[in-house]
UniProtKB/Swiss-Prot annotation:
It is an enzyme of class 2 (transferase). The lineage of its organism: Bacteria, Pseudomonadati, Pseudomonadota, Alphaproteobacteria, Hyphomicrobiales. GO terms for molecular function: protoheme IX farnesyltransferase activity. It is found in: Cell inner membrane. The keyword Cell membrane applies. Belongs to the UbiA prenyltransferase family. Protoheme IX farnesyltransferase subfamily. Pfam families: UbiA (PF01040). Keywords: Cell inner membrane, Cell membrane, Heme biosynthesis, Membrane, Transferase, Transmembrane, Transmembrane helix. The gene is ctaB. This is Protoheme IX farnesyltransferase.
């Protein structure tokens, strides 16, 4: 386990937030902006499928608070993981291991944004939404980052709950409660997470092993990982169509869900059938890339149907 005060690389002198030396972009990078975009997107879908109404200004402030909360947890994750980030090629250039920001600065920044995002969401929306955001931050930054990630090959499975919560928070903003719609969206993201990340883990197995992270390919072996990718994809395909059965996914969503679900299964089988060499890498990267497209298309279909009058019921 990394030390609470671990610093990788030289400290960066001067003020924490200035425009000199690229400090502002570095602090922004700590927030994992690509993850923040996904969080905003899935939280927004959680809002629009809810049976309720929220003032646009309140909705915008709430989305910003949710995004900042997600960024804060990402910042705390980078602070804790600075030692393993330094030995992995895809993370070695992050602000802390590269020495552009100190561990202490990142910790203070992450804690400040964590508290601020929860307080703002509580004031703008309601206490349930704020409590869910606080839980998400703690679960990702503490339970996943400080414990699960380095302790078990099920780290992605259990830790995936944090990434699946934004739609639930979004619905709580609108209705002050948790409904079946957001719980189904939670389940879809939760089941989507393992095959998505394990596809990447198959390619990066050596780096994860060098960093001491017990990812599934390093613990159960590549063959078992490939089989589990197929099983999760087989579970995800029908789960993705549940919104249609419950009446909040229409015809457009049904088509996207059916085609996308079959695609997930097809790509997972391709991973299973290509266990070696360049074919393995191409299959795993194909699975990784298609899984991103699948989730984006699925949630985009819901957003389009609910926001632009495209909803056409399939059942009933």
């Amino acid at each position: 386990m990394t030390s609470l005060t671990n610093t990788i690389g030289p400290d960066v002198p001067g003020p924490a937030l200035t425009t000199a030396g690229g400090d502002v972009p570095d602090y922004f990078a700590l927030l994992k902006p690509r993850v923040m975009v996904l969080v905003i997107f899935t939280a927004l879908v959680g809002m629009v499928v809810s049976q309720g109404h929220v003032q646009p200004a309140i909705g915008a402030i709430s989305l910003l608070a949710i995004a900042v909360g997600a960024g804060a947890s990402g910042c705390l994750n980078m602070w804790w993981d600075a030692d393993i980030d330094a030995v992995m090629s895809r993370t070695a250039t992050r602000p802390i291991p590269s020495g552009r920001i100190t561990s202490e600065e990142a910790l203070g920044f992450g804690l400040f944004l964590s508290v601020a995002s929860v307080v703002v969401l509580g004031l703008a929306a309601n206490l349930l939404a704020a409590a869910l955001l606080a839980f998400t931050i703690v679960f990702y930054a503490v339970v996943y980052s400080m414990w699960l990630k380095r302790a078990t090959a099920q780290n992605i499975v259990i830790g995936g709950a944090a990434g699946a919560l934004p739609p639930v928070i979004g619905q709580a903003v609108v209705t002050g409660s948790i409904g079946i719609e957001s719980l189904i969206l939670f389940a879809i993201i939760f089941i989507w997470t393992p095959p998505h990340f394990w596809a990447l883990a198959l390619i990066k197995a050596d780096e994860y092993a060098r960093a001491g992270i017990p990812m599934m390919p390093n613990v159960a072996g590549p063959a078992s990982t490939r089989r589990q990718i197929v099983w999760y994809s087989l579970l995800l395909a029908p789960l993705g169509l549940v919104p249609v059965a419950l009446g909040f996914g229409g015809l457009v969503y049904a088509v996207v869900g059916l085609v996308g679900g079959l695609g997930m299964v097809a790509f997972s089988i391709r991973v299973l059938r290509n266990p070696e060499g360049d074919a393995e890498r191409r299959a795993a990267m194909g699975m990784f890339g298609f899984s991103i497209l699948y989730l984006f298309a699925l949630f985009s279909a819901l957003l389009a149907e609910q926001s632009f009058g495209l909803f056409r019921p399939v059942l009933g």
